[in-house]
Swiss-Prot record:
Keyword Phosphoprotein included in the entry's annotation: no
Organism encoding this protein: Danio rerio
Gene3D superfamilies reported in the protein's UniProt record: Tetraspanin
Cytoplasmic topological segments: 1-13, 77-85, 225-239
GO cellular component: plasma membrane
Primary gene name: tspan9
Protein name: Tetraspanin-9
Length: 239
């Protein structure tokens, strides 16, 4: 009976972590594809040049892959050391998420102001030759979200030191339209647009966050249950 319970928990954990590992492979693949095919779509932040969408997805995919591999191997080999390592990794990730969440809510205003200032500093690099990625990123965001600058089109005037804006700020887009001051430009800043999107989708984002939390807790529960089952089975065998 005990052996049957052990096998049941073992294969449940293996399947759980196999899906986890496959998800990591998928994320890593998407990250590599973004890095290779969309390399020109880089970061908005001059302070964190490596903080691009591709690098974030690659990092996330790698962490998920390694964690899933630990869980799969620990389950199939019934290895207590690997199972404990899997539990500790998930616990560290969970604690890091909670700490970051608490810090974010405590320092929301400061984080927001620093983010705005950093993005504004990045606007100054818009026309420089070695920042094609930043330029493409701003062009895509402004066209898709129908916004201009960080808090408004005046950000571009300050950054470019002239009364012009990128062409993607124009409501009717054509070449050099940003230099024609009689044109109608998008008046809303992109930062505000992103805040609106986050507010509109807060329930969906909250649901996703809860699902991630449940998956982490399930992984920790499976690993500790299997760890205890193996430990007890070992004691009975020794006796």
């Amino acid at each position: 009976m005990a052996r049957g319970c052990l096998c049941c928990v073992k294969y449940m954990m293996f399947l759980f972590n196999l899906l986890f590992w496959l998800s990591g492979c998928g994320l890593l693949g998407v990250g590599i594809w973004l890095s290779v095919s969309q390399g020109s779509f880089a970061t908005f932040s001059p302070s964190f040049p490596s903080l691009s969408a591709a690098n974030l997805v690659i990092t996330l995919g790698s962490v998920v892959m390694v964690t899933g591999f630990l869980g799969c191997l620990g389950a199939i080999k019934e290895n207590k050391c690997l199972l404990l390592s899997f539990f500790i990794v998930l616990l560290i990730i969970l604690l890091a998420e909670l700490i970051l969440l608490i810090l974010f809510f405590v320092y929301t205003e400061k984080v927001s102001e620093n983010a705005k200032q950093d993005l504004k500093d990045g606007l100054r690099l818009y026309n420089t030759d070695n920042n094609v990625g930043l330029r493409n990123a701003w062009n895509i965001i402004q066209a898709e979200w129908q916004c201009c600058g960080v808090t408004g089109l005046s950000d571009w005037h300050e950054a470019l030191q002239e009364k012009s804006v990128p062409d993607r700020c124009c409501q009717e887009h054509y070449t050099e339209c940003g230099r024609n001051t009689t044109n109608v430009f998008w008046s809303q800043g992109c930062y505000e647009k992103v805040e609106e999107w986050l507010n509109d989708n807060k329930h969906l984002l909250g649901t996703i966050a809860m699902c991630v939390l449940v998956l982490q807790l399930l992984g920790m529960a499976f690993s500790m249950t299997l760890y205890q089952q193996i430990h007890r089975a070992g004691k009975k065998y020794d006796a």
